[in-house]
Amino acid sequence: MVSPSLRVPFAVALGAIGGSLSRYYLSLWFAERFGPSFPYGTLIINLSGCVVMGWFMTVAMERPEISPEIRLLFGVGFLGSYTTFSTYELDTFSLWQQHRFATGLVYWLGSCLFGALAMELGILLARLWR
């Protein structure tokens, strides 16, 4: 039996293994099937992760018999490593459910904009350190 203090990190880590392997092999499959000219795998993975995250979190919150460890294993571990996009959309939707529409919109657009800028910064830093 796992120590109570290790249950949370164990659940997240165990779920992450399956999520990351699923993402990896599905990405390969889509690239082999449709070619590398468009990131179909990433698109399908991100969208399917959002559907599954929405379904799972709705069901998990309505059913107390689903333990916190199972929520963490699947919601944070599996889906978090399958796609972080689903978590991003869940956070946005949560803000909107709280009627914090402006905050949700700023978060949603800001994540896209600042994510692109952060990517550009990372590229710039990598080029500077060559």
UniProtKB/Swiss-Prot annotation:
Residues binding Na(+): 80, 83
One Pfam entry name: CRCB
Chain segments annotated as transmembrane: 10-30, 41-61, 72-89, 105-125
Reactions listed under catalytic activity: fluoride(in) = fluoride(out)
The keyword Cell membrane appears for this protein: yes
Keywords: Cell inner membrane, Cell membrane, Ion channel, Ion transport, Membrane, Metal-binding, Sodium, Transmembrane, Transmembrane helix, Transport
Membrane topology reported for the UniProt record: Multi-pass membrane protein
Annotated HAMAP family: FluC
Reported function: Fluoride-specific ion channel. Important for reducing fluoride concentration in the cell, thus reducing its toxicity.
Entry protein name: Fluoride-specific ion channel FluC
